[in-house]
UniProtKB/Swiss-Prot annotation:
Gene: Rrbp1
Superkingdom of the source species: Eukaryota
Chain intervals with Polar residues compositional bias: 224-258, 274-338, 354-378, 385-399, 435-479, 495-519, 526-540, 576-720, 736-769, 811-821
Residue ranges, annotated region (61 X 10 AA tandem repeats of [NSQ]-[NKQVGA]-[GSAQKRT]-[ASGDTK]-[KGTQSAV]-[KGAED]-[EQVGIPTDMA]-[EGVAS]-[AGVPETNS]-[AQNGPTVS]): 196-808
GO CC annotations on file: endoplasmic reticulum membrane
Protein's name in the database: Ribosome-binding protein 1
Residue ranges that the UniProt entry lists as topological domain Lumenal: 1-7
Organism whose genome encodes this protein: Mus musculus
Modified residues (N6-acetyllysine): K1135
Length: 1605
């Protein structure tokens, strides 16, 4: 029950107030008659109130069991879910004694009795060191202290005191000071059955004690009590008898769980000098002591958390202080987990025998007691639920291993510890580098739960490899549930002990915030989660004489010891076997509580051992998809998960027996009810205990018919006890693999040799471990009729005995024992405490019975025999007496005895054959299993690597969680201080007296009543008017929607009509395409004719070429026309290009004409549909255009002919011109040669002439000189010409000769003159010759000049003729150009016609496309409008529903106001004066009501606007509909195409406008609907706020009434 819930708090406080007021009146009336003090009267009053309050709390707990599961998350934020460690409250009374021998005193609101059995909180045996409050005076003193510490006002005060008491527990542990726990009133504090971990009641057996004779799981000796069997309720969890030995007391005088000697040593004390439970070697540290000051069992490294070590100094499994002491080690001299002291106290026994295994103070909560003292680790309900596996201080550590002192897995005399690997073997929790938790061995040797080298914790399963109880993603320890932080039991933020979950809050298995225990069972008497072994030895303690769960033999390997690299007991290999899945409850060796397998599945059959909340996962449920500890395959059930209601492995139920409930001895370990379900029996008897997935073998599942894991026998051997020297639980032979020994193919945990023998099969013929009764279902009852774990076959057959060939579980190598062999050997093997006293086992049916002769004769005489039976008796007697058998035959015997024997032999042979076939089938299945195991082994290697990585990541997460825990611890301390201050103020108010408060409450109630009356009346009137208006508006809107739906239907009809028109247009287009093809065929014919004409033109062109050859003869004209022809050729080329372009244009014109014809035809076809008269005119025009086109085509053909002729002429002319060119070139070359020759001659002549002239000048000069020399008297000018000079010389010489010479000339001069004359004459002759030559050359030049001139004249004549021809050709070209221009003009006219028609056609196409597009758009818009209308309709419907809801909510508000009124009136009867803060509530309510009225009025106005706009939208829709109808009516009347197009445009524009208007109207409607919806939501919020305020006001009034005591 959550005391912070406002409703429950109000109800409880108000009820308490009424009860206390009545009690107070009664006390006041009787106060004067008795001479008692006021303090005593007040104490008695508070006692009575506490009892009444507690009874109410019990009722509410029973009614709200489901609510507890749902409120787990809320409890994390509240102090009762996680108790912080803070300073002690000054009011808490603590009794301090010696740290070792003094037990704590539980201060409770009820009196503390001296008798141990009647203590309300915790059973504390009488101790010589401590005097309990036995005398009446002492009782009164105690009661006074109680009155001061815990005034029973309400559950708030109790919760705060529990916080203080819990802080005292946490602070006192390091100094070995017992804690004082003050449980809340509602936590069954007064019930005598709420003793510690296993204390049930006077006769309530311990954790595993089930029914009257229901032995505990491991109850071994005659009167040996259960693990937690207290006696009448007195002894500790492990206290067995009067001073019965510890938790593990097994045989008659069996010592404690680990107590091995006469009674001396501690839990781990094995022999005389056996070391402590955790004592490893000579100086071996304690169970959890790792290094010099190493922490306890789970203490990993420097700051490594203990098995349950949670935060900075988080406590060990039992570690309470800052991390100092050993598992149970509390103070400096605190005893070890297996305290060695004088008489070997209990395993965790701290005082002389006082506290329970986890008992911390007298009434201190269990190790895992986390909350206000509410749920134990396995707190079942209220009546007598034991703690989960109350681990605490005395609880042996989950994985207590000790080296020599046999650990949890004590093997034999000196065998290795469960985790003992060598002398210095690491502790069970020794991690090696701080690695694995509880069961880590060395060298990768798997711990109890060790999976691989970096193997995860005890329950670490597969990829998600979380710890045994690892729940979340962040690898918690064995029971680690919470954020991923804590060790084996670390559950919440405050990482307490092994089971310590929250900051000091939940139990070992307490998973959620403070919710149910790990194995929270139910209520009536469900046993603890961790009820494990026979005497619930430490988590795995099994053997007969107190050996551990996996006690192997003298020196067998550890339970999980496989080999050096053997996989851990729980090594699953991705879904493989369970962690410690053993026999008897197949719980893992270390399967403890927190995450323990289904073993502790308590609830009504519901959750698994660790299954916490509604869907909480099992103990082994690991993380994201990790299945439960036993959950192996895809949907495989948990280890003990039975089915829907099937009992779990340890499913207790109301009176269900414990995990190992045998029955009177026979039932299996998990036999729960009538002896029916197997340990692992899941649903209809289907899956084994550990049945994992589809093909996953169970822990003990061997083959299909292999017996179950825990088959015990007649209840004799321990869970793992094999014989004296018998190998341990899974030990089969000397080399037989351990419990989890897989061999090479990783066989199942119990599968040993070929997978057949059971896990626990003991010795040669010893009955199975869990051998139950004659028909008791096996522990792991499979299917297919295969014998179950406990299947007996006449209660005798071996566990695994399938046939003569199937090796039994204990069958060692190839020994194949017959079915009867174990039956004979069984009694000899079971003598050492095999049967429990008063528990007869099932009879050995085949064993010899020794009866007296008289009784035999009497029985035989009284029996009636058949003939066959009588014959058999005769045979037996004849064999005894030696009489021949034939003499005893009857004369009337029907058959021959030999024939009968033959028949029997045949029947036996048949049975043998069937058994052999079954054996062959089993062998084949074993081979398949071996293959599967090989594949699983490979998967396991990958899984281990992943798990190692996850461990590293999760260690980091643990560090982060520790930091968070420290912060949350500080916050909790602050909250506790604040709550203590509030408690003081409440106490002060209580002391002031109830009268003033009652008066105030009466005034307040009257004010509230008036305000509520006014508010309800106003709200009702306004809501009624608003609802009426809303209904009217909704009816209007509905009508409008109907009208709009009709309009949309009409629009759909119009759209269909438009679609029909579009179909007709498509047909017309197809017709036009056909006509277009016909016109193309006609054009092709025309082109063929043109090609023929071109051929003719080519022939004429050839003729012209012949004429051109004749013209080549005129070579003289070629020279003249040469230059002009080039220009003419250029022009001709340009003309040719123009002609080619004209040709192309003509072709285009033809194509366009054809297109025009086609378009005209299409236009005609279109016009014919609507215009009957215009069709005839258009046909005539078309015919005229066709005739015109034909004429144009004929003209074009003529032009083409002319152009072809011109081309031929031009080509002929070109040929002639080419010939003339060639001749001209030849003539030019000849002329050039002649000119060159003449020039050379002229050059040579000019040179000769120059030379001759030079010689003449020289000769003349010489003659002049000589003549002047002869005739010096002559004076002649030298500048004269030579001829003139000679003439003058002749004249002057003759004159001189005529004169008488004065001197006679000499002969020399005369000779010289003669020589000069001769030379002159010779020179003159040469000059004459030169002159003649010059004259000849000049003549020749003149002749050449004349010839050249003549040739030039010839060329000029030719050029003139060519020019004339060119002129003629130009004239013809001009004529052709004129013709072409005319054709162009005609073509342009046709082009204009064509363009006009194409323009018309394009416009028609555009209009058609636009019309079709607009039709489509219109259809889309109509569809959108329809959708908008539908949406508006749906929104209006929603508005209606919301209005209805609002009206309902208003009615609820009215009802609540009336209830408040009546409640306030009721409060006036016993009320007090009003409190000033409550007077403000009616004013607030009035103001809020006024606001709601204003909002309702605004909403009404908005709704009116909405209706108006909706009407406008409806009108626009009607207009659109009318216009569409008009368009439909006007459609067929229109005639002309152009008018139709314009009208279509207008219509489409109108339709667009109308659709846009409709869209706007729809948008407005949507906006208005949104606004109305927002207003409705606002009104809802206001109504909710009003309701909340009313509820708060009601709660406040009730709380004030309750506090005014």
């Amino acid at each position: 029950m959550d005391i912070y819930d406002t409703q429950t708090l109000g109800v409880v406080v108000f009820g308490g107030f009424m009860v206390v007021s009545a009690i107070g009146i009664f006390l006041v009336s009787t106060f004067s008659m008795k001479e008692t003090s006021y303090e005593e009267a007040l104490a008695n009053q508070r006692k009575e109130m506490a009892k009444t309050h507690h009874q109410k709390g019990e009722k509410k707990k029973k009614e709200k069991t489901v609510e507890k599961k749902g409120k787990t998350k809320k409890k994390e934020e509240k102090p009762n879910g996680k108790i912080p460690e803070h300073d002690l409250d000054p009011n808490v009374t603590i009794i301090l004694k010696e740290p070792v021998r003094v037990s704590a005193v539980a201060v409770a609101p009820t009196s503390v009795h001296s008798s141990v059995g009647h203590t309300p909180i915790a059973t504390v045996p009488a101790m010589p060191q401590e005097k309990l409050a036995s005398s009446p005076k002492d009782r009164k003193k105690k009661e006074k202290k109680v009155a001061k510490v815990e005034p029973a006002v309400s559950s708030i005060v109790n919760s705060i005191q529990v916080l203080a008491s819990k802080s005292a527990i946490l602070e006192a542990t390091p100094k070995e000071v017992p804690m004082v726990a003050v449980p809340p009133v509602g936590s069954k504090a007064s019930s005598p059955a709420t003793s510690s971990q296993g204390k049930k009641g006077q006769g309530a057996q311990n954790q595993a004690k089930k029914g009257e004779g229901a032995q505990n799981q491991g109850k071994k000796g005659e009167g040996a009590q259960n693990q937690a069997k207290k006696g009448e309720g007195a002894q500790n969890q492990a206290k067995k008898g009067e001073g019965a030995q510890n938790q593990g007391k097994k045989g008659e005088g069996a010592q404690n769980q680990a107590k091995k000697g006469e009674g001396g040593q501690n839990q781990a004390k094995k022999g005389e000098g056996a070391q402590n439970q955790g004592k490893k070697g000579e100086g071996a540290q304690n169970q959890g002591k790792k290094g010099e000051g190493a922490q306890n069992q789970a203490k990993k490294g420097e700051g490594a958390q203990n098995q349950a070590k949670k935060g900075e100094g988080a406590q060990n499994q039992g570690k309470k202080g800052e991390g100092a002491q050993n598992q149970s080690k509390k103070g400096e001299g605190a005893q070890n987990q297996a305290k060695k002291g004088e008489g070997g106290q209990n395993q965790a026994k701290k005082g002389e025998g006082a506290q329970n295994q986890a008992k911390k103070g007298e009434g201190a909560q269990n190790q895992a007691k986390k909350g206000e003292g509410v749920q134990n680790q396995a707190k079942k309900g209220v009546e007598g639920a034991q703690n989960q596996g109350k681990k605490g201080e005395a609880n042996q550590n989950q994985a207590k291993k000790g080296e020599g002192g046999q650990n949890q897995t004590k093997k034999g005399e000196g065998p290795q510890n469960q985790g003992k690997k060598g002398e210095a073997a690491q502790k069970q929790d020794k991690k090696i580098e701080g690695a694995q938790n509880q069961g880590k061995k060395p060298e990768g040797t798997s711990n109890q739960g060790k999976k691989g080298e970096g193997a995860q914790n005890q329950g670490k399963k597969g990829e998600g490899a979380q710890n045994q109880s690892k729940k979340g993603e962040g690898a918690q320890n064995q029971a680690k549930k919470g954020e991923g932080g804590q060790n084996q039991a670390k559950k919440g933020e405050g990482a307490q002990n092994q089971a310590k979950k929250g900051e000091g809050a939940q139990n070992q298995a307490k998973k959620g915030e403070g919710v149910q225990n790990q194995a929270k069972k139910g209520v009536e008497g469900a046993q603890n989660q961790g009820k494990k072994g026979e005497a619930n030895q430490n988590q795995a303690k099994k053997g007969e004489g107190g050996q551990n769960q996996t006690k192997k033999g003298e020196g067998p390997q550890n339970q999980g010891k496989k080999g050096e690299a053997a996989q851990k007991q729980d090594k699953k290999i991705e879904g493989a076997q369970n962690q410690g899945k053993k026999p008897e409850g197949t719980s893992n060796q270390g399967k403890k509580g927190e995450g323990a397998q289904n073993q502790g599945k308590k609830g009504e059959g519901a959750q698994n051992q660790g299954k916490k909340g509604e869907g909480a996962q099992n103990q082994g449920k690991k993380g994201e998809g990790a299945q439960n500890q036993g959950k192996k395959g895809e949907g495989a059930q948990n280890q003990g998960k039975k089915g829907e209601g099937a009992q779990n492995q340890g499913k207790k139920g109301e009176g269900a027996q414990n995990q190992g409930k045998k029955g009177e001895g026979p039932q299996n370990q998990a036999k729960k009810g009538e002896g029916a379900q197997n340990q692992g029996k899941k649903g209809e008897g289907a899956q084994n205990q550990g049945k994992k997935g589809e093909g996953a073998q169970n822990q003990g599942k061997k083959a299909e018919g292999v017996q179950s894991q825990s088959k015990k026998g007649e209840g004799t051997q321990n869970q793992g006890k094999k014989g004296d020297g018998n190998p341990n639980q899974g030990k089969k032979g000397e080399g037989a693999s351990n419990q989890n020994r897989k061999t090479d193919t990783v066989a199942n945990q119990g599968t040993k040799q070929e997978g057949v023998s059971n896990q626990v099969k003991k010795s040669e013929g010893s009955p199975n471990q869990g051998k139950k009764a004659e028909g008791a279902p096996n522990q792991g009852k499979k299917k297919d009729g295969s014998p179950s774990q406990a299947k007996k076959v006449d209660a005798a057959a071996n566990q695994g005995k399938k046939s003569e060939m199937a090796p039994a579980q204990g069958q060692k190598a190839s020994m194949v024992q017959s079915q009867e062999a174990p039956k004979q050997d069984a009694p000899a093997k079971k003598k050492s405490g095999s049967r429990k006293k008063g528990e007869p086992g099932p009879p050995d049916c085949d064993g010899p019975l020794f009866l007296p002769y008289k009784t035999l004769v009497s029985t035989v005489g009284s029996m009636v025999f058949s003939e066959g039976e009588a014959q058999r008796l005769i045979e037996i007697l004849s064999e005894k007496t030696g009489v021949i058998q034939d003499t005893w035959h009857k004369a009337t015997q029907k058959g021959d005895p030999v024939a009968i024997l033959k028949r029997q032999l045949q029947e036996k042979e048949k049975l043998l054959a069937t058994e052999q076939e079954d054996a062959a089938v089993a062998k084949s299945k074993l081979r398949e299993l071996n293959k599967e195991m090989a594949s699983e082994k490979a998967k396991a290697a990958a899984g281990e690597a992943k798990v190692k990585k996850q461990l590293v990541a999760r260690e980091q997460e643990i560090a982060a969680v520790q930091a968070r825990m420290q912060a949350s611890y500080r916050d909790h301390v602050k909250e506790v201080q604040q709550l203590q201050g509030k408690i003081r103020t409440l106490q002060e108010q209580l002391e002031n007296g109830p009268n003033t408060q009652l008066a105030r409450l009466q005034q307040e109630n009257s004010i509230l009543r008036d305000a509520l009356n006014q508010a309800t009346s106003q709200v009702e009137s306004k809501q009624n008017t608003e609802l009426a208006k809303l209904r009217q508006e909704l009816s209007k809107v509905n009508k409008e929607l109907v009208e709009k739906s009709e309009a949309s239907r009409q629009e759909e009809q119009q759209r269909k009509a438009l679609e029909a028109k579009a179909a007709t247009f498509e047909k017309q287009v197809l017709q036009l395409q056909a006509s277009h093809k016909e016109s193309e065929e006609a054009l092709q014919k025309r082109l063929e004719e043109v090609t023929r004409e071109l051929c003719r033109a080519q022939t004429s062109h050839a003729n012209l070429r012949a004429d051109a050859e004749k013209a080549q003869e005129q070579q003289q004209r070629v020279a003249e026309l040469h230059s002009k022809l080039q220009s003419s050729e250029v022009e001709v080329k340009s003309k040719c290009e123009e002609l080619s372009s004209l040709h192309g244009q003509l072709k285009e014109a033809r194509a366009e004409n054809s297109q025009l014809t086609e378009r005209i035809r299409s236009i005609e076809a279109l016009l014919e549909a609507g215009q009957a008269q215009d069709t005839q005119a258009s046909h005539a025009e078309a015919n005229q255009q066709q005739t015109r086109l034909k004429e144009l085509e004929s003209q074009v053909s003529c032009l083409e002919k002319e152009t072809s002729e011109l081309k031929e002429a031009m080509e002929q002319q070109k040929g002639k011109n080419n010939d003339l060119r060639e001749k001209n070139w030849k003539a030019m070359e000849a002329l050039a040669l002649a000119e060159r020759a003449c020039e050379e001659k002229l050059r040579s002549l000019t040179q000769a002439k120059e030379e001759s002239e030079k010689q003449l000048h020289l000769a003349e000069a010489q003659t002049k000189e000589t003549l002047l020399a002869l005739l010096p008297g002559l004076s002649i000018s030298a500048h004269q010409n030579y001829a003139e000079w000679l003439q003058e010389f002749k004249e002057k010489g003759s004159e001189l000769l005529k004169k008488p010479p004065t001197l006679e000339p000499s002969m020399d001069i005369v000779l010289k003159l003669r020589e000069a004359e001769e030379t002159q004459n010779s020179l003159q002759a040469e000059c004459d010759q030169y002159r003649t030559i010059l004259a000849e050359t000049e003549g020749m030049l003149k002749d050449l000049q004349k010839s050249v001139e003549e040739e030039e004249r010839v060329w000029k004549a030719k050029v003139g003729a060519a020019e004339e021809e060119l002129h003629k050709s130009r004239v013809t070209v001009k004529h052709l150009e004129d013709i072409v221009e005319k054709l162009k003009g005609e073509l342009e006219s046709s082009d204009q016609v064509r363009e006009h028609t194409s323009h018309l056609e394009a416009e028609l196409e555009k209009h058609m496309a636009a019309a079709s597009a607009e039709c489509q758009n219109y259809a889309k818009e109509v569809a959108g409008l329809r959708q908008l209308l539908l949406e508006s309709q749906s929104q209006l419907d929603e508005a209606k529903s919301e209005a209805q809801k609002q009206s309902d909510e208003l009615a609820l508000v009215r009802q609540q106001l009336s209830d408040m009124r009546s409640h306030v009136e009721d409060g006036d009867v016993a009320g007090s004066p009003a409190v000033p803060p409550a007077e403000q509530d009616p004013m607030k309510l009035k103001t809020q009501l006024e606001r709601t009225e204003a909002t309702l009025e605004a909403e009404q106005t908005r709704r009116q606007k909405l209706t108006a706009e909706f009407e406008e939208a409806q009108r626009t829709a009607c207009r659109i509909q009318e216009e569409l109808e008009k368009l439909r009516a006007a459609g067929p009347l229109e005639s002309s195409g152009k008018e139709e197009i314009t009208q279509l445009k207008e219509r489409l524009e109108k339709e667009k406008r109308l659709t846009s208007d409709l869209g706007r109207a729809a948008i407005k409607l949507q906006e208005l609907l949104k606004t109305t919806q927002e207003q409705l939501t606002k009104e809802k919020d206001t109504v909710k706020k009003l309701q909340e305020q009313l509820g708060k006001a009601e709660d406040g009034s009730s709380s004030k009434e309750g506090t005014s005591v």
